Amino acid sequence: MKKAISTNNAPAAIGPYSQAIKTGNMFFLSGMLPIDPATGEFAPGMAAEQTEQIFKNIKALLAEAGLTLDNVVKTTVFLSDMADFAAMNEVYAKHFSQPYPARSAFAVKTLPKNALVEIEIIASEA
């Protein structure tokens, strides 16, 4: 059975979807934008700062489900410009330790609200 996971410590969904879903021992987080939930505004700065805010939001949703970044098994990173990959990757690397989650990264034409970075995750309790 699936259960919606939500918290006020991460930005609310901006469409007909859940912030996250937990089913069995699996946790699926919708694509997370760099929105500060306290202000509803993007984190100031460029790709590195946006990535840092995204991780704050991800950690808040994981905590709501009783999980941490150690439970993350897969990430998908979307960039509006692949030139921002190095800046995103530097911040990303600070948040994970080995064994790192599997990851895919894509450059896309545009992201919601013209974000520079969006990250979605899959985590497991096991």
Predicted regions and their residues:
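Short, polar/acidic, helix-capping and beta-turn segments at strand->helix junctions
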Residues: K2-A126
